[in-house]
Curated annotation (Swiss-Prot):
It comes from the Viruses. The record marks R273 as: Important for VP1 folding and capsid assembly. It comes from Human hepatitis A virus genotype IA (isolate LCDC-1). This is Genome polyprotein. GO terms for biological process: symbiont entry into host cell; virion attachment to host cell.
Amino acid sequence: QVGDDSGGFSTTVSTEQNVPDPQVGIKGKANRGKMDVSGVQAPVGAITTIEDPVLAKKVPETFPELKPGESRHTSDHMSIYKFMGRSHFLCTFTFNSNNKEYTFPITLSSTSNPPHGLPSTLRWFFNLFQLYRGPLDLTIIITGATDVDGMAWFTPVGLAVDTPWVEKASALSIDYKTALGAVRFNTRRTGNIQIRLPWYSYLYAVSGALDGLGDKTDSTFGLVSIQIANYNHSDEYLSFSCYLSVTEQSEFYFPRAPLNSNAMLSTESMMSRIAAGDLESSVDDPRSEEDRRFESHIECRKPYKELRLEVGKQRLKYAQEELSNEVLPPPRKMKGLFSQS
């Protein structure tokens, strides 16, 4: 039976448990709670177990059944908008003092290495095509138990902005930030923020295939700034992690070769590449008999070729049967020694 360890064999590592101590002999004040004191009991109606009492009364059930032919899973995993519509890691930074701001540009160029350049999936994706046009979704995850007032805003390329990649006091006025569309938040009330960065550029599109860093080239989408206030670094920890994703309005133009194509595996034997699984075969896989018959019926040049071959086989078969079953004349009777006269 499953889970029966009577035979002395178990797939799980046995852990030696502490012997129950009915006399409440726990040593140390830090390891002693109110429930460990003798005579103290839980209040009437209080739940002392982790399990939810509501779930214990529910009838076990599975997903609702659907009619045959009705699809339950409707997400298209081959769609670029589905895959890149999920948030992918962009950057992270930590504040060390109060009343500071941090600005980072969203540069699509592949020549800039992290942390100033796109990392991982984003770097690979934005080099699969020449030009990008459209808005982007920015997700900001806040880490740390703090009660800090914050403000985030997006600055298009070419407008006034604080020094990127440096934690410093902002030199911009509050009126200027508000005109750009600032978003205010409090870290005690929210742990994540999602902002749709607009497509606001004097260019028709930006490219990840160009060199450059910052806002001096045609590869920068824009700059994002985050400012904080009421932050005490001595007893608090505040960190921001940013993630980027495309939107349904994103447009990708002119596919190109993947990044780092010179790192692809090279060999003189094509069969070894196919055997290694990194190269598709140039011919189709062996088809089933049903597929072969179906394709033979829709062949337009000689639609009755297979039929004529099959008829020829049957004619040869019948001819062989006729030869083997041909009626021969009865044998002649011979007079021998034992024949009666």
